[in-house]
């Protein structure tokens, strides 16, 4: 799923932020994202899940919030892989979904959640990001 009103054709990104849930990129590195965009860099975000197991809000609310954050920050691209929240695996099928996004945008730099994080999805997401980048 892509955020509407963005031109995704032939979009080479300087930086691609990979996040387990909608709002992770904003909470973890929005200052960095804004700084990079102000420097003229093309920055995008790929959210792995819709955050459907989150205790605050619904997937629909999270989608609307991420679309609004995309506009406010001036992101050049944002996609959601719609992987099952809480239970996603770092397996071949999931890696290939992410590889498709990586090859589409050909980022020079990738940012992801920390490998060691209080939230288990963040660590799993970081490992998925690392593995997909090397396929």
Model-derived features: positions:
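Active-site rim/loop-helix segments in enzyme catalytic domains that contact anionic ligands
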Residues: 1-105
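Active-site adenylate/phosphate-handling loop in enzymes that bind or generate adenylated species
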Residues: 101-135
